[in-house]
Amino acid sequence: MDSITQLEARANEVAAAARRLAEYCRNARVDGACLPAVVPSEAPRAIREIQRLLLSNVDHLQILLTEPADLVQRLAVQSQLLSCLQWLGEFQVLACLPLTDTVSIADLARLSGVPEAQLARIIRFTITIGFLQEPQRGHVAHSPLSSLFVSRPSLRDAVMFLADSAAPTALQMASATGRFGDTVASETDTAYNIAFDHRDPFYFACEQRPKLQRRWSAYLQHTGGDARDLTQQVLSRVDWFNLNNACVVEVLGPQSQSVTMMLDQLHPMLHFIVQEARIPNGSTHAALHQDVRSVQIRELGGPQRVRDAAIYILNLGPLPHAILSTSVLTELRAHFSVLAANSCAMLILTAGLLLPKPGAVDARVETSVRLHDLSLLQLANDRLMEEDELVEMVHGVKDSVGRLAVVNRLHLPCTTTVALGVRYQAFGHGDSSAKSL
């Protein structure tokens, strides 16, 4: 499709999606006068999908129409916006501003202990993108957008991590390459270590500094790097209704969010067992899952004592790539004999965010995933696993008679999170035993 045809098609799709969103909001009696966003957070999944498609088409239109100077200007605006949000956060300016009232900029400056003239210049810049508002000359109030950064502290934490950690680290990526080369095995020869001039690995620094850990978690949450909720979503799409009264075992990694409680509420006839996997040098869960019917502690790679389950869920991510790949391979080997002895049993493997093939998913989704992948490189010489890499790992677990095989892939729309259905296959047999997840 040539660029002119693309331009027309994308514009038509934007217009159609906008009309459908507007129709939904009117029917749902959404108050359009005081919105933090056009589409409310409780909107149905179908409406959220329309919103996503609209944003994707807007992104494509921007790519088609952007000139080089536009890109430079956009980068300049974003860098200044980040510095302004950091400044407002550092001096707790937003916390000093009432959520539902207007104050003079002079009074806000006195409350915050900052220069009035500088505060006014910063406020008037952020207003241009909808952050804060000036209802009358010299007076400031929250906008729907800025008020969320007060009511949802994780948004402020995410911005502060971006400004204080992620951005300074990213700008040292070239220096790290020049100084260290391709030192992917080192946790300390990183852009992060250059930016902050110390030798502590990033993950160790997070363990030692709760504020850094909190901000890192918030950054992942709001940039699409936290796949724990996505894992729940993709596993909720498995066809559990055909299992009747079967047993389901979930092997849970130290940083994973269990899906068992969610599934147990939806499918009470199933019998769930959670096995908390102890990973060497890894953290452990703060508390057992008291509402789950059965909880076990199991060493990573230890023998799987539950041999009559219909489904085994490996829910090990998120973990650093080296630990994740080793943990997944160890658990696949631990379940090999169980799956070989029971051809009806299936292992469902999830590994958090996976890198897609270039161009294989929506550009907006791919941007988010590759953003996270680069952040891992710069902070810790870490990386995301590729889907094909995970599949090859599964297929490499074998003996002289057969192997583990991926018989189904369940993708979650608009993400790169996937659940792989794995069964034992004897050599010489095709995929005839494959069943839908």
UniProtKB/Swiss-Prot annotation:
Annotated GO molecular function terms are: DNA binding
**Signal peptide position in this chain?**
none
Which signals induce this protein?
Expression is positively regulated by the transcription factors brlA and laeA.
Q: Where is the HTH iclR-type domain?
A: 75-144
SUPFAM superfamilies attached to this UniProt entry: Winged helix' DNA-binding domain (SSF46785)
Q: Give compartment(s).
A: Nucleus
What does the entry give for GO biological process? secondary metabolite biosynthetic process
One GO CC term, this protein: nucleus
Record's keyword annotation contains Disulfide bond: no
Q: In which tissues is it expressed?
A: Specifically expressed in conidia.
What the record says about disrupting the gene is: Resulted in loss of trypacidin production.
Which keywords label this protein? Answer: DNA-binding, Nucleus, Transcription, Transcription regulation
Look up the DNA-binding region in the UniProt entry and give its residue ranges.
105-124
Per the record, the major location class is nucleus
| PANTHER family assigned to the protein according to its UniProt record, in alphabetical order | MONODICTYPHENONE CLUSTER TRANSCRIPTIONAL COACTIVATOR MDPA (PTHR43712:SF15), PUTATIVE (AFU_ORTHOLOGUE AFUA_4G14580)-RELATED (PTHR43712)
What the protein does comes down to:
Transcriptional coactivator; part of the gene cluster that mediates the biosynthesis of trypacidin, a mycotoxin with antiprotozoal activity and that plays a role in the infection process. With tpcE, coregulates the production of trypacidin.
This one is known as: Trypacidin cluster transcriptional coactivator tpcD
